Curated annotation (Swiss-Prot):
GO terms for molecular function: hydroxyproline O-arabinosyltransferase activity. It is found in: Golgi apparatus membrane. PANTHER family: HYDROXYPROLINE O-ARABINOSYLTRANSFERASE RDN1, PEPTIDYL SERINE ALPHA-GALACTOSYLTRANSFERASE. It is a single-pass type II membrane protein. Keywords: Glycosyltransferase, Golgi apparatus, Membrane, Signal-anchor, Transferase, Transmembrane, Transmembrane helix. It comes from the Eukaryota. Its EC number is 2.4.2.58. The gene is RDN1. The chain crosses the membrane at residues 13-33. It catalyses: trans-4-hydroxy-L-prolyl-[protein] + UDP-beta-L-arabinofuranose = O-(beta-L-arabinofuranosyl)-trans-4-hydroxy-L-prolyl-[protein] + UDP + H(+). This is Hydroxyproline O-arabinosyltransferase RDN1. Probable glycosyltransferase involved in the O-arabinosylation of several proteins including extensins and small signaling peptides. Catalyzes the transfer of the initial L-arabinose to the hydroxyl group of Hyp residues. Probably involved in the arabinosylation of CLE12, a signaling peptide that moves from root to shoot, to interact with SUNN receptor kinase signaling that regulates nodulation. Involved in long distance nodulation signaling events. Its main location: Golgi. GO terms for cellular component: Golgi membrane. It comes from Medicago truncatula (Barrel medic).
Amino acid sequence: MIVRKSMGRVKSLLMLLMVLGFSFATYNLVFMMMEHKAGNDLGSFDGKAMEIRNTNSKYHVAVTATDAAYSQWQCRIMYYWYKKTKDMPGSAMGKFTRILHSGRGDQLMNEIPTFVVDPLPEGLDRGYIVLNRPWAFVQWLEKAVIDEEYILMAEPDHIFVNPLPNLATENEPAGYPFFYIKPAENEKIMRKFYPKENGPVTDVDPIGNSPVIIHKYMLEEIAPTWVNISLRMKDDPETDKAFGWVLEMYAYAVASALHGIKHILRKDFMLQPPWDLDVGKKFIIHFTYGCDYNLKGKLTYGKIGEWRFDKRSYLMGPPPKNLSLPPPGVPESVVRLVKMVNEATANIPNWDSLNRS
Protein backbone atom coordinates (compact mmCIF):
# COMPACT_ATOMS: atom_id res chain seq x y z
CA MET A 1 0.00 0.00 0.00
CA ILE A 2 1.24 3.49 -0.81
CA VAL A 3 1.60 5.67 2.28
CA ARG A 4 0.20 9.19 1.80
CA LYS A 5 0.89 12.19 3.99
CA SER A 6 -2.42 13.72 3.11
CA MET A 7 -5.47 12.29 4.84
CA GLY A 8 -7.43 13.35 1.77
CA ARG A 9 -5.30 11.06 -0.37
CA VAL A 10 -5.76 8.20 2.10
CA LYS A 11 -9.52 8.62 2.01
CA SER A 12 -9.38 8.79 -1.78
CA LEU A 13 -7.41 5.55 -1.96
CA LEU A 14 -9.86 3.84 0.38
CA MET A 15 -12.73 5.04 -1.79
CA LEU A 16 -11.00 3.64 -4.88
CA LEU A 17 -10.63 0.26 -3.19
CA MET A 18 -14.31 0.35 -2.28
CA VAL A 19 -15.24 1.30 -5.85
CA LEU A 20 -13.15 -1.51 -7.29
CA GLY A 21 -14.58 -3.98 -4.81
CA PHE A 22 -18.12 -2.91 -5.67
CA SER A 23 -17.35 -3.03 -9.39
CA PHE A 24 -15.92 -6.54 -9.24
CA ALA A 25 -18.98 -7.64 -7.30
CA THR A 26 -21.22 -5.93 -9.85
CA TYR A 27 -19.38 -7.57 -12.74
CA ASN A 28 -19.61 -11.01 -11.15
CA LEU A 29 -23.26 -10.43 -10.42
CA VAL A 30 -23.87 -10.29 -14.17
CA PHE A 31 -23.25 -14.00 -14.47
CA MET A 32 -25.57 -14.81 -11.59
CA MET A 33 -28.41 -12.83 -13.08
CA MET A 34 -28.36 -14.18 -16.62
CA GLU A 35 -31.12 -16.70 -15.94
CA HIS A 36 -33.39 -13.82 -15.01
CA LYS A 37 -32.16 -11.44 -17.67
CA ALA A 38 -35.58 -10.64 -19.09
CA GLY A 39 -36.75 -8.88 -15.98
CA ASN A 40 -33.57 -8.15 -14.07
CA ASP A 41 -30.92 -6.66 -16.35
CA LEU A 42 -27.93 -5.24 -14.49
CA GLY A 43 -28.51 -1.57 -13.92
CA SER A 44 -31.33 -1.37 -16.42
CA PHE A 45 -32.91 1.47 -14.42
CA ASP A 46 -36.41 0.00 -14.76
CA GLY A 47 -37.38 1.54 -11.45
CA LYS A 48 -36.22 5.00 -12.41
CA ALA A 49 -36.95 5.07 -16.10
CA MET A 50 -39.65 7.46 -17.18
CA GLU A 51 -41.39 8.05 -20.47
CA ILE A 52 -38.88 9.01 -23.14
CA ARG A 53 -39.20 12.64 -23.99
CA ASN A 54 -37.18 15.55 -25.22
CA THR A 55 -36.06 17.70 -22.35
CA ASN A 56 -35.19 21.32 -21.83
CA SER A 57 -33.43 20.50 -18.55
CA LYS A 58 -30.03 22.10 -18.20
CA TYR A 59 -26.85 20.05 -18.10
CA HIS A 60 -23.66 20.67 -16.16
CA VAL A 61 -20.55 20.96 -18.34
CA ALA A 62 -17.75 18.85 -16.82
CA VAL A 63 -14.26 18.57 -18.28
CA THR A 64 -11.45 16.48 -16.79
CA ALA A 65 -8.01 18.05 -16.91
CA THR A 66 -4.49 18.16 -15.48
CA ASP A 67 -2.36 21.09 -14.33
CA ALA A 68 0.01 20.77 -17.31
CA ALA A 69 0.30 23.82 -19.56
CA TYR A 70 -0.93 21.74 -22.51
CA SER A 71 -4.18 21.02 -20.71
CA GLN A 72 -4.49 24.50 -19.24
CA TRP A 73 -4.45 26.52 -22.44
CA GLN A 74 -7.03 24.23 -24.04
CA CYS A 75 -9.29 24.55 -20.99
CA ARG A 76 -9.03 28.34 -21.11
CA ILE A 77 -10.15 28.43 -24.74
CA MET A 78 -12.93 25.97 -24.04
CA TYR A 79 -14.19 27.99 -21.06
CA TYR A 80 -14.11 31.21 -23.09
CA TRP A 81 -16.45 29.71 -25.68
CA TYR A 82 -18.63 28.11 -23.01
CA LYS A 83 -19.25 31.57 -21.57
CA LYS A 84 -20.05 32.99 -25.01
CA THR A 85 -22.55 30.29 -25.96
CA LYS A 86 -24.06 29.47 -22.55
CA ASP A 87 -26.94 31.93 -22.71
CA MET A 88 -27.57 31.90 -26.45
CA PRO A 89 -31.03 30.82 -27.66
CA GLY A 90 -31.15 27.04 -27.93
CA SER A 91 -28.48 26.40 -25.31
CA ALA A 92 -29.25 24.22 -22.29
CA MET A 93 -25.90 24.79 -20.59
CA GLY A 94 -25.84 25.08 -16.84
CA LYS A 95 -22.76 25.52 -14.70
CA PHE A 96 -19.20 24.52 -15.62
CA THR A 97 -16.60 22.50 -13.73
CA ARG A 98 -13.02 21.68 -14.60
CA ILE A 99 -12.37 18.43 -12.71
CA LEU A 100 -8.65 18.74 -11.98
CA HIS A 101 -7.19 15.29 -11.32
CA SER A 102 -3.71 16.47 -10.38
CA GLY A 103 -4.49 16.31 -6.67
CA ARG A 104 -3.71 19.99 -6.11
CA GLY A 105 -4.90 23.38 -7.28
CA ASP A 106 -3.22 25.47 -9.95
CA GLN A 107 -3.09 29.07 -11.17
CA LEU A 108 -6.40 28.82 -13.04
CA MET A 109 -8.51 28.20 -9.94
CA ASN A 110 -9.79 31.79 -9.90
CA GLU A 111 -10.43 31.88 -13.66
CA ILE A 112 -12.23 28.58 -14.25
CA PRO A 113 -14.62 26.89 -11.79
CA THR A 114 -12.54 23.93 -10.62
CA PHE A 115 -13.00 20.88 -8.42
CA VAL A 116 -9.75 19.17 -7.35
CA VAL A 117 -9.67 15.37 -7.11
CA ASP A 118 -6.89 12.86 -6.61
CA PRO A 119 -5.16 11.00 -9.42
CA LEU A 120 -5.01 7.24 -9.34
CA PRO A 121 -2.38 5.85 -6.96
CA GLU A 122 1.10 6.22 -8.38
CA GLY A 123 1.87 3.77 -11.16
CA LEU A 124 -1.66 2.49 -11.57
CA ASP A 125 -2.24 4.41 -14.81
CA ARG A 126 0.97 2.94 -16.31
CA GLY A 127 1.67 6.18 -18.15
CA TYR A 128 -1.81 6.26 -19.69
CA ILE A 129 -3.03 9.42 -18.00
CA VAL A 130 -6.54 9.14 -19.46
CA LEU A 131 -7.21 6.32 -16.98
CA ASN A 132 -7.62 9.09 -14.42
CA ARG A 133 -10.77 10.31 -16.18
CA PRO A 134 -13.27 7.72 -14.88
CA TRP A 135 -11.75 7.87 -11.40
CA ALA A 136 -12.03 11.68 -11.48
CA PHE A 137 -15.73 11.43 -12.30
CA VAL A 138 -16.33 8.94 -9.48
CA GLN A 139 -14.81 11.36 -6.96
CA TRP A 140 -16.58 14.42 -8.34
CA LEU A 141 -19.97 12.72 -8.35
CA GLU A 142 -19.38 11.52 -4.80
CA LYS A 143 -18.15 14.79 -3.30
CA ALA A 144 -19.42 17.75 -5.34
CA VAL A 145 -22.74 19.55 -5.20
CA ILE A 146 -24.18 19.35 -8.74
CA ASP A 147 -27.36 21.33 -9.24
CA GLU A 148 -28.23 20.12 -12.73
CA GLU A 149 -29.85 16.74 -13.37
CA TYR A 150 -27.81 16.14 -16.54
CA ILE A 151 -24.08 16.18 -17.21
CA LEU A 152 -22.12 16.87 -20.39
CA MET A 153 -18.80 15.06 -20.26
CA ALA A 154 -16.44 17.13 -22.38
CA GLU A 155 -12.70 17.47 -23.03
CA PRO A 156 -10.26 20.41 -23.05
CA ASP A 157 -9.95 20.32 -26.86
CA HIS A 158 -13.66 20.98 -27.37
CA ILE A 159 -14.89 24.35 -28.63
CA PHE A 160 -18.60 25.15 -28.58
CA VAL A 161 -19.36 26.39 -32.08
CA ASN A 162 -23.17 26.47 -31.86
CA PRO A 163 -25.53 26.60 -28.86
CA LEU A 164 -25.87 23.04 -27.56
CA PRO A 165 -29.31 21.87 -26.40
CA ASN A 166 -29.85 18.90 -24.13
CA LEU A 167 -29.73 16.01 -26.59
CA ALA A 168 -30.44 13.36 -23.95
CA THR A 169 -33.60 12.09 -22.29
CA GLU A 170 -34.26 10.74 -18.82
CA ASN A 171 -33.33 7.19 -19.80
CA GLU A 172 -31.30 7.67 -22.98
CA PRO A 173 -27.96 9.49 -22.94
CA ALA A 174 -26.69 11.13 -26.12
CA GLY A 175 -23.26 10.34 -27.53
CA TYR A 176 -21.13 10.80 -30.62
CA PRO A 177 -20.42 7.74 -32.84
CA PHE A 178 -16.67 7.43 -33.44
CA PHE A 179 -15.73 5.65 -36.65
CA TYR A 180 -12.75 3.96 -34.97
CA ILE A 181 -14.69 2.43 -32.05
CA LYS A 182 -15.67 -0.94 -33.51
CA PRO A 183 -16.95 -3.42 -30.91
CA ALA A 184 -18.15 -5.95 -33.51
CA GLU A 185 -14.75 -6.08 -35.21
CA ASN A 186 -13.07 -6.75 -31.85
CA GLU A 187 -15.48 -9.40 -30.58
CA LYS A 188 -12.81 -11.73 -29.20
CA ILE A 189 -11.45 -8.99 -26.97
CA MET A 190 -14.84 -7.56 -26.13
CA ARG A 191 -16.01 -10.93 -24.79
CA LYS A 192 -13.42 -10.69 -22.02
CA PHE A 193 -15.40 -7.79 -20.61
CA TYR A 194 -18.85 -8.21 -22.14
CA PRO A 195 -19.72 -11.93 -21.91
CA LYS A 196 -21.97 -13.69 -24.41
CA GLU A 197 -24.60 -14.06 -21.71
CA ASN A 198 -25.07 -10.29 -21.82
CA GLY A 199 -26.04 -10.28 -25.47
CA PRO A 200 -24.44 -9.42 -28.82
CA VAL A 201 -21.43 -7.11 -28.87
CA THR A 202 -23.51 -4.76 -31.00
CA ASP A 203 -25.15 -3.83 -27.69
CA VAL A 204 -21.94 -1.88 -27.04
CA ASP A 205 -22.27 1.56 -28.59
CA PRO A 206 -19.45 2.90 -30.84
CA ILE A 207 -18.75 5.78 -28.47
CA GLY A 208 -16.42 7.13 -25.84
CA ASN A 209 -17.40 9.02 -22.74
CA SER A 210 -17.03 12.35 -24.46
CA PRO A 211 -18.98 14.07 -25.73
CA VAL A 212 -21.86 12.50 -23.85
CA ILE A 213 -24.89 14.12 -22.21
CA ILE A 214 -26.26 11.82 -19.55
CA HIS A 215 -28.62 11.93 -16.59
CA LYS A 216 -26.72 12.22 -13.34
CA TYR A 217 -28.18 9.07 -11.79
CA MET A 218 -27.05 7.00 -14.78
CA LEU A 219 -23.48 8.30 -14.59
CA GLU A 220 -23.39 7.61 -10.86
CA GLU A 221 -24.22 3.98 -11.67
CA ILE A 222 -21.86 3.63 -14.64
CA ALA A 223 -18.77 5.42 -13.29
CA PRO A 224 -17.52 2.76 -10.81
CA THR A 225 -17.89 0.06 -13.48
CA TRP A 226 -16.10 2.35 -15.95
CA VAL A 227 -13.14 2.62 -13.53
CA ASN A 228 -13.04 -1.13 -13.11
CA ILE A 229 -13.27 -2.00 -16.81
CA SER A 230 -10.62 0.62 -17.69
CA LEU A 231 -8.13 -0.86 -15.23
CA ARG A 232 -8.91 -4.43 -16.29
CA MET A 233 -8.44 -3.55 -19.96
CA LYS A 234 -5.14 -1.82 -19.23
CA ASP A 235 -4.01 -4.85 -17.25
CA ASP A 236 -4.71 -7.20 -20.18
CA PRO A 237 -1.80 -7.06 -22.68
CA GLU A 238 -3.89 -8.13 -25.68
CA THR A 239 -6.56 -5.52 -24.99
CA ASP A 240 -4.02 -2.81 -24.21
CA LYS A 241 -2.20 -3.45 -27.49
CA ALA A 242 -5.37 -3.61 -29.57
CA PHE A 243 -7.12 -0.54 -28.17
CA GLY A 244 -4.14 1.69 -27.39
CA TRP A 245 -5.03 5.33 -26.79
CA VAL A 246 -8.78 4.65 -27.18
CA LEU A 247 -8.87 1.97 -24.46
CA GLU A 248 -10.68 4.19 -21.97
CA MET A 249 -13.30 4.99 -24.61
CA TYR A 250 -14.03 1.30 -25.12
CA ALA A 251 -14.19 0.92 -21.34
CA TYR A 252 -16.94 3.53 -21.06
CA ALA A 253 -18.90 1.92 -23.88
CA VAL A 254 -18.64 -1.52 -22.25
CA ALA A 255 -19.53 -0.18 -18.81
CA SER A 256 -22.65 1.44 -20.26
CA ALA A 257 -23.68 -1.77 -21.99
CA LEU A 258 -23.18 -3.79 -18.80
CA HIS A 259 -25.74 -1.50 -17.20
CA GLY A 260 -28.17 -1.96 -20.08
CA ILE A 261 -27.75 1.58 -21.38
CA LYS A 262 -27.98 2.54 -25.05
CA HIS A 263 -27.05 6.00 -26.27
CA ILE A 264 -28.78 8.18 -28.82
CA LEU A 265 -26.08 8.49 -31.50
CA ARG A 266 -25.78 12.06 -32.78
CA LYS A 267 -23.38 12.68 -35.64
CA ASP A 268 -24.16 16.39 -35.36
CA PHE A 269 -22.85 16.43 -31.79
CA MET A 270 -19.32 17.17 -32.98
CA LEU A 271 -17.06 17.78 -35.95
CA GLN A 272 -13.38 16.91 -36.22
CA PRO A 273 -11.24 18.98 -38.60
CA PRO A 274 -9.66 18.36 -41.02
CA TRP A 275 -11.86 15.35 -41.84
CA ASP A 276 -15.18 17.13 -41.33
CA LEU A 277 -15.19 19.96 -43.84
CA ASP A 278 -18.18 22.07 -42.80
CA VAL A 279 -19.41 23.35 -39.46
CA GLY A 280 -23.06 23.60 -40.43
CA LYS A 281 -25.36 23.00 -37.47
CA LYS A 282 -22.92 20.84 -35.51
CA PHE A 283 -22.31 21.84 -31.91
CA ILE A 284 -18.69 21.15 -30.92
CA ILE A 285 -15.36 21.44 -32.74
CA HIS A 286 -12.95 18.74 -31.56
CA PHE A 287 -9.44 19.77 -32.56
CA THR A 288 -7.70 16.49 -31.78
CA TYR A 289 -6.20 16.01 -35.26
CA GLY A 290 -3.37 18.01 -36.77
CA CYS A 291 -4.33 20.19 -39.73
CA ASP A 292 -1.56 20.30 -42.35
CA TYR A 293 -1.90 21.96 -45.76
CA ASN A 294 0.34 23.25 -48.51
CA LEU A 295 -0.03 26.81 -49.70
CA LYS A 296 -2.47 25.68 -52.39
CA GLY A 297 -4.88 24.52 -49.70
CA LYS A 298 -4.27 20.80 -50.22
CA LEU A 299 -4.29 18.52 -47.18
CA THR A 300 -0.90 16.92 -46.47
CA TYR A 301 -1.97 14.76 -43.52
CA GLY A 302 0.92 12.66 -42.23
CA LYS A 303 3.39 15.23 -43.51
CA ILE A 304 4.04 18.59 -41.88
CA GLY A 305 2.40 21.19 -44.04
CA GLU A 306 3.57 24.62 -45.16
CA TRP A 307 0.64 25.81 -43.06
CA ARG A 308 -0.37 23.87 -40.00
CA PHE A 309 -2.31 23.94 -36.77
CA ASP A 310 -1.72 21.07 -34.39
CA LYS A 311 -2.37 21.30 -30.68
CA ARG A 312 0.66 19.07 -30.07
CA SER A 313 2.90 21.86 -31.30
CA TYR A 314 2.13 23.60 -27.99
CA LEU A 315 2.89 20.99 -25.35
CA MET A 316 4.89 23.31 -23.11
CA GLY A 317 2.96 26.52 -23.52
CA PRO A 318 0.04 28.18 -25.30
CA PRO A 319 -0.13 28.98 -29.00
CA PRO A 320 0.68 32.59 -29.81
CA LYS A 321 -2.00 35.15 -30.39
CA ASN A 322 -3.15 35.89 -33.92
CA LEU A 323 -2.26 32.62 -35.61
CA SER A 324 -2.02 32.90 -39.38
CA LEU A 325 -5.20 31.89 -41.17
CA PRO A 326 -5.14 28.90 -43.52
CA PRO A 327 -4.42 29.49 -47.22
CA PRO A 328 -7.30 29.72 -49.72
CA GLY A 329 -8.99 26.40 -50.42
CA VAL A 330 -8.76 25.03 -46.87
CA PRO A 331 -12.13 23.76 -45.56
CA GLU A 332 -14.39 26.06 -43.59
CA SER A 333 -14.09 23.87 -40.48
CA VAL A 334 -10.35 24.54 -40.21
CA VAL A 335 -10.74 28.25 -40.91
CA ARG A 336 -13.46 28.52 -38.27
CA LEU A 337 -11.32 26.66 -35.74
CA VAL A 338 -8.36 29.00 -36.14
CA LYS A 339 -10.56 32.09 -36.02
CA MET A 340 -12.16 30.86 -32.79
CA VAL A 341 -8.77 30.14 -31.23
CA ASN A 342 -7.59 33.61 -32.24
CA GLU A 343 -10.65 35.30 -30.77
CA ALA A 344 -10.21 33.47 -27.49
CA THR A 345 -6.50 34.20 -27.16
CA ALA A 346 -7.08 37.88 -27.97
CA ASN A 347 -9.57 38.21 -25.12
CA ILE A 348 -8.30 35.91 -22.36
CA PRO A 349 -6.21 37.89 -19.83
CA ASN A 350 -2.52 37.03 -19.41
CA TRP A 351 -2.65 34.60 -22.29
CA ASP A 352 1.08 34.47 -22.98
CA SER A 353 2.23 34.22 -19.38
CA LEU A 354 -0.30 32.43 -17.17
CA ASN A 355 -0.23 28.90 -18.55
CA ARG A 356 3.32 27.73 -19.12
CA SER A 357 5.09 24.65 -17.79
